[in-house]
Amino acid sequence: YEIMPSLVGSEMCIRDSIMTELAQMFELQQSATFFGSWGGLALALLGAGLAAVLSGIGSAKGTGMAGEAGAGLLCQDPGKFGKVMILQVIPGTQGLYGLVVWFFAIFRMGLLSGSLPELTIAQGFQYLAACLPMALGGLFSAIAQGRVAAGSINILAKKPDDWSKGMVLCITVEFYAILSLLASMLMIINISA
């Protein structure tokens, strides 16, 4: 009877050892997958890229709309080029803000150090979420600002002395792009390393 308890204990020890080995192999296999190894970095880069790309798309569309309206006016009155140019450039600031968020995010990730950082999935999602305000805010505010700038060019065409009122209207939309920039920057600053 005394030998049996020791055999049962040995079997339990072997079983625990096998289970531990299997668990370690599973963890190793899971960490070797793309998402396990690089998922956090991939999510973070996706967020940073979206901030730059979507803001840039919005700025391109916004400045394009304002440029189309400005081209019509400049055919009739080339002397208004300076004022038209100012109104056309205003929707382009969101692209710049998106690039600032992209640069700040990759700086905080540690990508500028020369080596690839190891970010957890949670950190990757934090970067993605932090970059979304600028990505979406930049996209939609730049398009809206382009429409306002195009309308302001119509003000310049009909009442040249009142063109500054159109600038004030454009700056009102700019305020929300600045809020998007601020939200993204504050969120990125608070991501733990």
Which stretches of residues belong to each language-model region?
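Single conserved hydrophobic/aromatic residue that forms the stacking wall/gate
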Residues: 1-16
